[in-house]
């Protein structure tokens, strides 16, 4: 995030939103794990962790709640894809004059359907040790773009109300961005031959492996019939509770 600002970029609200969500949620997770390890001692003032946890909790609310920022992250990506689809729609109406645009899009989608991606666009930017991780980031980015386009084609402007889907999109985007940041940091360490470089590569690979699984799961949920049906059920459950202004089911003890 600091690197983006230092580069002179004037628009970094998306990166800022992702960084805020990622940092605040992971800081909470790490502190919670620390208290779990310390057991009862974690609650003692002398230890100091309980104060850290108390203060950290507000960060998921300050400067925009993380729930709202997740929607912002997803909708920002959708806004870009929507603009691309509108341009393509105009081109299709006059294919002769816009042959290059239409042909390029057909070729791109044809390659995608055959499993031929855009390649490793990050290959020249990362240390050779990390080429395979960078290639997976590119693949995940392409999967993300395809998922966004399919959602837009299916839901159109109504996508803004599909918050279960948007939340999965945001989670995938955050994981992709976080992995890219780790690649950048680790590449610098490897290039400068820092003493911690090999350890940082290990951390980067471990993170990327887990992130890849989460990304596949979140993007897969957007087209999984069982998952989509579950989203509808959860939406109906929420509606029932709101209409009842209380849990719908009675107390199991009959009280």
What name fits each language-model region?
Residues 1-255:
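Flavin-dependent oxidoreductase catalytic core characteristic
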């Amino acid at each position: 995030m600091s690197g983006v600002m230092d580069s002179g970029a004037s628009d970094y609200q998306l990166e800022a939103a992702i960084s805020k969500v990622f940092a605040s949620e992971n800081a909470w997770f790490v502190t919670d794990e620390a208290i779990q390890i310390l057991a009862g001692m974690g609650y003692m003032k002398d230890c100091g962790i309980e104060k850290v946890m108390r203060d950290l909790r507000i960060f998921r609310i300050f400067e925009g709640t993380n729930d709202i920022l997740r929607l912002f992250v997803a909708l920002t990506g959708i806004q870009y894809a929507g603009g691309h689809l509108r341009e393509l729609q105009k081109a299709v109406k006059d294919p002769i004059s816009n042959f290059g645009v239409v042909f390029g899009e057909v070729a791109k989608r044809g390659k995608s359907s055959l499993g031929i991606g855009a390649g490793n666009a990050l290959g020249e930017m990362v240390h050779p040790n990390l080429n395979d991780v960078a290639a997976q980031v590119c693949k995940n980015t392409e999967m993300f773009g395809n998922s966004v386009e399919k959602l837009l084609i299916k839901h159109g402007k109504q996508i803004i109300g599909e918050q279960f889907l948007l939340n999965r999109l945001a989670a995938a985007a955050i994981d992709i961005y976080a992995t890219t940041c780790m690649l950048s940091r680790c590449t610098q360490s490897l290039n400068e031959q820092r003493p911690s470089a090999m350890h940082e590569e290990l951390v980067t690979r471990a993170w990327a492996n887990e992130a890849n699984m989460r990304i596949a799961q979140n993007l897969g949920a957007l087209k999984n019939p069982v998952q989509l049906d579950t989203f509808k059920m959860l939406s109906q459950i929420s509606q029932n509770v709101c209409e009842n202004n209380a849990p719908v089911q009675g107390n199991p003890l009959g009280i």
